[in-house]
């Protein structure tokens, strides 16, 4: 399935926006707080409080390694994809087998790791910083999962280019 012009523009901006999100937000799972910008710490802290994101609060080891993979594999790919989408015509993007291969690899990696996060949210979601680890309500789980859902669905489409 090819990417049309509008889809290419969408993914161009998706990757542009995802670069600072990866650097300042997602990286908070692996980078010690003393090396993070204050504003990034506040954004993460506010997100955890508002969305009850126990994963970003808890930072389980498996999530740590997912984020390491995001920083080592996906972040350089974001720059590569931005360059390719910015400087290529629709025909070039759809006929560039190397680009398509990397889009698929990114798609599978990002959608699978995010799917695991979503499953964990529904399986054991709880309110962060609560001593009793009170379970999230179904509404709260759905709200938190909806934050993760775009980073499952958007990359999933790339598995089929």
UniProtKB/Swiss-Prot annotation:
Keywords: Endoplasmic reticulum, Membrane, Transmembrane, Transmembrane helix. InterPro entries: EXPERA, Sigma-2_receptor-like, Sigma2_recept. Residues 7-159 form the EXPERA domain. The chain crosses the membrane at residues 11-31, 62-82, 102-122, 142-160. Residues 32-61, 123-141 are lumenal. GO terms for biological process: protein targeting to mitochondrion. Part of an import route for newly synthesized mitochondrial proteins termed the ER-SURF pathway (ER surface-mediated protein targeting), which retrieves mitochondrial precursor proteins from the ER surface and reroutes them to mitochondria for efficient mitochondrial import. Acts as a quality control factor in the ER, promoting the proteolytic degradation of nonproductive and extramitochondrial precursor proteins in the ER membrane thus removing them from the ER surface. Present with 358 molecules/cell in log phase SD medium. Belongs to the TMEM97/sigma-2 receptor family. This is Efficient mitochondria targeting-associated protein 19. The gene is EMA19.
């Amino acid at each position: 399935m090819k990417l049309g012009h509008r889809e290419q523009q969408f993914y161009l901006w998706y990757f542009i926006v995802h670069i600072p999100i990866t650097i300042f937000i997602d990286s908070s799972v692996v980078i010690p707080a003393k090396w993070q910008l204050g504003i990034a710490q506040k954004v993460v802290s506010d997100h955890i409080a508002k969305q009850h994101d126990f994963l970003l609060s808890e930072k389980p080891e498996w999530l740590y390694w997912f984020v390491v993979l995001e920083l080592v594999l996906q972040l350089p790919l974001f720059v590569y994809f931005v360059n390719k989408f910015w400087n290529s015509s629709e025909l070039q993007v759809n006929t560039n087998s190397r680009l398509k291969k990397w889009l698929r690899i990114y798609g599978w990696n990002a959608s699978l790791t995010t799917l695991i996060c979503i499953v964990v949210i529904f399986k054991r979601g709880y309110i962060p910083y609560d001593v009793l680890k009170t379970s999230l309500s179904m509404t709260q789980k759905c709200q938190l999962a909806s934050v993760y859902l775009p980073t499952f669905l958007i990359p999933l489409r790339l598995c089929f280019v």
